[in-house]
Amino acid sequence: MDLARQLKNAISSGNLLFGQRQTMSACNSSDARMVIIAANCPTDYIEDLRSRHPDVPMHQVALVNRELGAACGKPFPVSAIAIVDGG
């Protein structure tokens, strides 16, 4: 199963948060089970997120933020996704 299909399944059946601020907030409150990061997400954000939350699994995908947003069915770019409940 490809990433786009998995994301659409998670969106329809689970709880995902989109964007850098919401992802950081979910990690700060220990709600995030996993984080998906776009290929062109700023390096300083990724390093900050990894240093503050080393216990949260993070996966950087090959898709840039516009492609990641489209894969999620969103009309806007998405650079970070926090999976709170995968469904």
List each model region and its residues:
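Charged, alpha-helix-enriched surfaces in structured cytosolic catalytic cores
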Residues: 2, 44, 63-66
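Fold-independent oxyanion-binding glycine-rich loops
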Residues: 20-21, 39-40, 81-86
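C-terminal structural segments of small proteins and small subunits
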Residues: 55-87
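N-terminal first-folded block
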Residues: 2-34
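Surface-exposed beta-strand edges and their flanking turn/coil or helix-capping segments
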Residues: 6, 31-33, 50, 73, ...
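N-terminal positively charged helical leader segments and presequences
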Residues: 22-59
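Absolute protein N-terminus
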Residues: 1-2, 87
